[in-house]
Amino acid sequence: MAKPKKQHRRYREDLTETPDWLMKKKCPHKANYMSGKRILPKGLTGKEKLPQIVDDIFLAYNSARLKEGCQLFRDKMLEPDVTIGMTLSGALTPAGLGCSCVVPLINAGFVDWIVATGANLYHDMHFALNYPVHVGSFKFDDTDLRENDLVRIYDVIIPDSDALMATDEILRDILIQPEFQKEMGTAELHYLLGKYCVEWERKNGLRNVSVLAAAYRAGVPCYTSSPGDSTIGM
């Protein structure tokens, strides 16, 4: 039987020498990678303006991506003769984003065209019609909501009969009018609906609550690639 080979331990002859793996490496690109702003922001005092917070505090992760979006909007999109398109996806108008954000941007001239899901433009009409849309909770029991004639969009609560079905009924009456009895694109369809939204706002003593109404007043076309995901298309 062969004897096992003797294992030799490795010893450093000069213990004062630094091991190779501890030697300072040559890092030719290190300076480039470390050329970004040092992360050492000053503490917030409560006196900062929003632009200062975005530029000086939003330094990393999703806050940095938000800062990039803000700077892109400020430095590029607001330049003269720049065409700005807006896309809306997800339940934005039921959450009030139409009233609070989209309408002011349209009124300020910062939107040249919109592409939205059909559902966003449909739910936008509830606001022009002054139908109730309320804050709820994602924890609500959907079965109990159904028994109480309510519908939940995550944590937004909308009455079924008094908002959804009522909007559907009005839409059915509108879409049989002569002006709709022809082939048309989605921009023309929503332009015509926007005219009705303007009138509903006026009758309800409201202003600047509907994206379709604001788009109609500003001449901003509203397209959708998915008209069938709401009553408008169905």
Q: What residue ranges belong to the model's regions?
A:
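Metallocofactor- and cofactor-centric catalytic cores in central/energy metabolism, strongly enriched
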Residues: A2-M165, E169, I174-K182, K195-M234
